[in-house]
Amino acid sequence: MMSFRGHLTPGRRFDIPTTVISPAISPAPRDAWEVVLRSDPNALESQSPAWTDAACATGSFEDASRLYETVDGRLLVLPMLRRRHTVGALAVEASNPPGWGVGGLLAPGGPTTAEVATVFSELAGRRVLTQRLWPNPLAAESWAEGAPDNAKGTERVAHLIDLQGGFDHVWSKLFEKSSRRGARHAEREGVTVECDTTGRLIPEFYRLHSQAVSRWSRLQHEPEWMAMRRHHRNDPREKFEAIARCLGERCQVWVARIDRKPIASMIVLQGNNAYDFRAAMDDDYTSYRANDLLLRLAVCDACRAGCRFYYMGDSGHSVTLARFKERFGARPYDYAEYLLERLPISTVERGLKQAVKRAIRFREAGLIG
């Protein structure tokens, strides 16, 4: 374990829960953070120090992670990013911000309800404008029971594939027949797949992702310029390049091609668990079933790497998207995102967004890609 001076301390125990914690150290020392990350079986790479490095490399955030130690030596880490140029009582912090995936508390064996409640209490006492917490869906029960009454909760639904039993079990018992058939169809049609961990394939992924945003804008009755402006602000190419650079081999970029033309791509973060972080496809080539083949290969690789779960992200209220994920054996997990704020900023933001949507006659679309 790690003392608050940032050095490994032998002989300390990780497995004794308590609701007594020391004052937080921020930013969290990286060696302690890495130890806690690897000892939490539900951890995702979006909770890693490398992920924070990637977010900070974009120039939009600063590391505001927090390290706690219990009276019995158990370490807890809360990854946290602070929006640049917001400080003190005007600070805007999140674990993690929108567009940056799952955050939330890390602990050896996973956080307990008592630990979540204690950290919530510590956060609530800080003079910070807003603190947004997007926890791991696998820890939903601890967060639901530990959240205070003044934490605003937003219901979410995530889909995860349980990889226990290995790929043969997942393929034969969890993948539906239509998905297995789709993967074989893609191979017969000549779809080829490449996986890279150097960032070399980011440009191909990003072109497909940008095309998908343009397509979504038409389906959702949103002006294309508005959708693309938001896309380049929230998901610039430099963001994905930073992720690939900072995570290295833990960031896989998969690209499916037909006659050398990229037709589908996804970014998978691989650690204790696999995280299907982003995916996009060329809608003109859906008949090739490239997504089915990509998912077969990515899930197989996650099983081979020893991942316990394959996280397919949130599904929102889209029945179509949920059904797509369930074809590959994913199951829904209900959980909540939490917000601590000193002023009703979220209420104002939500009202403005709804007003814009009404003005452009925006309609939700259940989309894949």
Regions found by a protein language model. Name each.
Residues 41, 127, 209-217, 302, ...:
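A generic secondary-structure signal for well-formed alpha-helical elements
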